[in-house]
Protein backbone atom coordinates (compact mmCIF):
# COMPACT_ATOMS: atom_id res chain seq x y z
CA UNK A 1 0.00 0.00 0.00
CA UNK A 2 1.44 3.33 -1.08
CA UNK A 3 1.92 5.91 1.66
CA UNK A 4 0.01 9.14 1.05
CA UNK A 5 1.95 12.40 1.10
CA UNK A 6 0.43 15.44 2.82
CA UNK A 7 -1.34 17.88 0.49
CA UNK A 8 -1.95 20.49 3.17
CA UNK A 9 -2.55 21.18 6.83
CA UNK A 10 -5.75 21.02 8.86
CA UNK A 11 -4.83 24.28 10.59
CA UNK A 12 -8.24 24.75 12.19
CA UNK A 13 -8.02 21.23 13.60
CA UNK A 14 -4.79 21.80 15.53
CA UNK A 15 -6.42 22.92 18.76
CA UNK A 16 -9.28 20.41 18.49
CA UNK A 17 -7.06 17.36 17.96
CA UNK A 18 -4.29 18.45 20.35
CA UNK A 19 -6.79 18.92 23.19
CA UNK A 20 -8.38 15.52 22.49
CA UNK A 21 -4.97 13.80 22.45
CA UNK A 22 -3.97 15.38 25.76
CA UNK A 23 -7.23 14.27 27.39
CA UNK A 24 -6.94 10.75 25.93
CA UNK A 25 -3.33 10.27 27.02
CA UNK A 26 -4.19 11.29 30.57
CA UNK A 27 -6.93 8.65 30.73
CA UNK A 28 -4.37 5.86 30.42
CA UNK A 29 -4.82 3.66 33.52
CA UNK A 30 -1.08 3.03 33.96
CA UNK A 31 -0.14 6.63 34.82
CA UNK A 32 -0.23 6.00 38.59
CA UNK A 33 -0.87 9.64 39.48
CA UNK A 34 1.46 11.13 36.88
CA UNK A 35 0.30 13.55 34.19
CA UNK A 36 1.29 13.69 30.55
CA UNK A 37 1.85 17.32 29.61
CA UNK A 38 1.91 19.09 26.25
CA UNK A 39 5.47 20.00 25.26
CA UNK A 40 6.59 20.48 28.86
CA UNK A 41 9.33 18.33 30.39
CA UNK A 42 11.49 18.79 33.45
CA UNK A 43 15.26 18.82 33.05
CA UNK A 44 15.55 15.33 34.54
CA UNK A 45 12.13 13.71 34.36
CA UNK A 46 8.58 13.91 33.09
CA UNK A 47 6.22 12.65 30.42
CA UNK A 48 5.01 14.87 27.59
CA UNK A 49 3.74 14.71 24.05
CA UNK A 50 4.46 16.88 21.05
CA UNK A 51 3.64 17.08 17.37
CA UNK A 52 6.23 18.61 15.11
CA UNK A 53 3.96 18.87 12.06
CA UNK A 54 0.46 19.26 13.49
CA UNK A 55 -2.59 17.85 11.68
CA UNK A 56 -2.01 17.05 8.01
CA UNK A 57 -4.48 16.60 5.15
CA UNK A 58 -3.62 13.50 3.10
CA UNK A 59 -6.58 13.41 0.72
CA UNK A 60 -9.53 15.62 -0.08
CA UNK A 61 -12.74 15.08 -2.01
CA UNK A 62 -15.16 17.85 -2.93
CA UNK A 63 -18.65 16.84 -4.07
CA UNK A 64 -20.72 18.69 -6.65
CA UNK A 65 -22.66 20.17 -3.72
CA UNK A 66 -19.41 21.60 -2.27
CA UNK A 67 -19.28 19.11 0.60
CA UNK A 68 -15.64 18.46 1.52
CA UNK A 69 -14.34 15.23 3.05
CA UNK A 70 -10.71 15.19 4.11
CA UNK A 71 -8.60 12.26 5.26
CA UNK A 72 -6.17 13.60 7.84
CA UNK A 73 -3.50 12.44 10.21
CA UNK A 74 -1.96 13.85 13.37
CA UNK A 75 1.49 12.38 13.99
CA UNK A 76 2.88 12.92 17.47
CA UNK A 77 5.26 11.34 19.91
CA UNK A 78 5.19 10.70 23.63
CA UNK A 79 8.46 11.50 25.40
CA UNK A 80 9.39 9.91 28.73
CA UNK A 81 12.42 11.62 30.29
CA UNK A 82 14.32 9.91 33.10
CA UNK A 83 17.68 9.80 34.84
CA UNK A 84 17.37 6.04 35.33
CA UNK A 85 20.64 4.25 34.69
CA UNK A 86 19.83 0.65 35.55
CA UNK A 87 18.73 -1.76 32.88
CA UNK A 88 15.57 -2.89 34.72
CA UNK A 89 14.46 0.76 35.12
CA UNK A 90 14.92 1.37 31.41
CA UNK A 91 13.00 -1.82 30.61
CA UNK A 92 10.15 -0.57 32.82
CA UNK A 93 10.02 2.67 30.81
CA UNK A 94 10.01 0.72 27.55
CA UNK A 95 7.20 -1.49 28.89
CA UNK A 96 5.22 1.57 30.03
CA UNK A 97 5.46 3.22 26.60
CA UNK A 98 4.65 -0.03 24.77
CA UNK A 99 1.59 -0.56 26.98
CA UNK A 100 0.46 3.03 26.43
CA UNK A 101 0.81 2.53 22.68
CA UNK A 102 -1.14 -0.72 22.74
CA UNK A 103 -3.89 0.89 24.80
CA UNK A 104 -4.14 3.81 22.35
CA UNK A 105 -4.54 1.27 19.52
CA UNK A 106 -7.43 -0.43 21.39
CA UNK A 107 -5.36 -3.48 22.31
CA UNK A 108 -5.82 -4.98 25.79
CA UNK A 109 -3.07 -4.13 28.30
CA UNK A 110 -2.36 -5.35 31.81
CA UNK A 111 -1.79 -2.72 34.51
CA UNK A 112 -1.38 -3.81 38.13
CA UNK A 113 -2.73 -7.28 37.29
CA UNK A 114 -5.92 -5.85 35.73
CA UNK A 115 -6.74 -5.82 32.03
CA UNK A 116 -7.77 -2.54 30.40
CA UNK A 117 -8.82 -1.79 26.85
CA UNK A 118 -9.78 1.50 25.22
CA UNK A 119 -13.30 0.92 23.91
CA UNK A 120 -13.82 4.03 21.81
CA UNK A 121 -11.83 6.96 20.57
CA UNK A 122 -12.72 10.39 21.93
CA UNK A 123 -15.22 12.43 20.00
CA UNK A 124 -13.77 15.40 18.18
CA UNK A 125 -15.70 18.61 17.57
CA UNK A 126 -16.28 20.42 14.29
CA UNK A 127 -17.21 17.30 12.24
CA UNK A 128 -13.90 15.52 12.81
CA UNK A 129 -13.83 11.82 13.69
CA UNK A 130 -10.92 9.59 14.71
CA UNK A 131 -10.88 6.46 12.55
CA UNK A 132 -7.67 4.77 13.68
CA UNK A 133 -4.62 5.13 15.91
CA UNK A 134 -1.34 3.41 15.04
CA UNK A 135 2.02 3.35 16.78
CA UNK A 136 5.60 2.38 16.24
CA UNK A 137 7.93 0.76 18.76
CA UNK A 138 9.26 2.85 21.63
CA UNK A 139 12.98 3.59 21.64
CA UNK A 140 15.56 5.42 23.74
CA UNK A 141 17.71 8.32 22.60
CA UNK A 142 21.31 9.00 23.58
CA UNK A 143 21.51 10.39 27.16
CA UNK A 144 21.83 14.19 27.53
CA UNK A 145 24.79 15.93 29.16
CA UNK A 146 22.95 15.89 32.54
CA UNK A 147 22.56 12.08 32.19
CA UNK A 148 18.82 12.29 31.55
CA UNK A 149 17.55 10.16 28.70
CA UNK A 150 14.47 10.58 26.53
CA UNK A 151 12.41 7.59 25.44
CA UNK A 152 10.11 8.11 22.44
CA UNK A 153 6.83 6.52 21.36
CA UNK A 154 5.75 7.63 17.85
CA UNK A 155 1.96 7.59 17.36
CA UNK A 156 -0.29 8.60 14.46
CA UNK A 157 -3.99 9.43 14.66
CA UNK A 158 -5.97 9.09 11.45
CA UNK A 159 -9.20 11.03 11.26
CA UNK A 160 -11.74 12.48 8.86
CA UNK A 161 -12.85 16.08 8.60
CA UNK A 162 -16.07 17.03 6.82
CA UNK A 163 -17.47 20.48 6.08
CA UNK A 164 -19.37 22.47 3.47
CA UNK A 165 -17.73 25.21 1.44
CA UNK A 166 -20.79 27.44 1.45
Where do the PLM segments sit?
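Charged, amphipathic alpha-helical segments and their flanking helix caps
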Residues: 1-37, 56-166
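Amphipathic, interaction-prone secondary-structure segments
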Residues: 40-62
Amino acid sequence: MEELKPIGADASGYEVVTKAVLELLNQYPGLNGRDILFEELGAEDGIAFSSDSGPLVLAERISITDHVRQSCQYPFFVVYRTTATREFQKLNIQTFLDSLGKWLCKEPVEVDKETYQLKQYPKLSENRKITRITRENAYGLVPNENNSQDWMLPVTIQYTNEFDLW
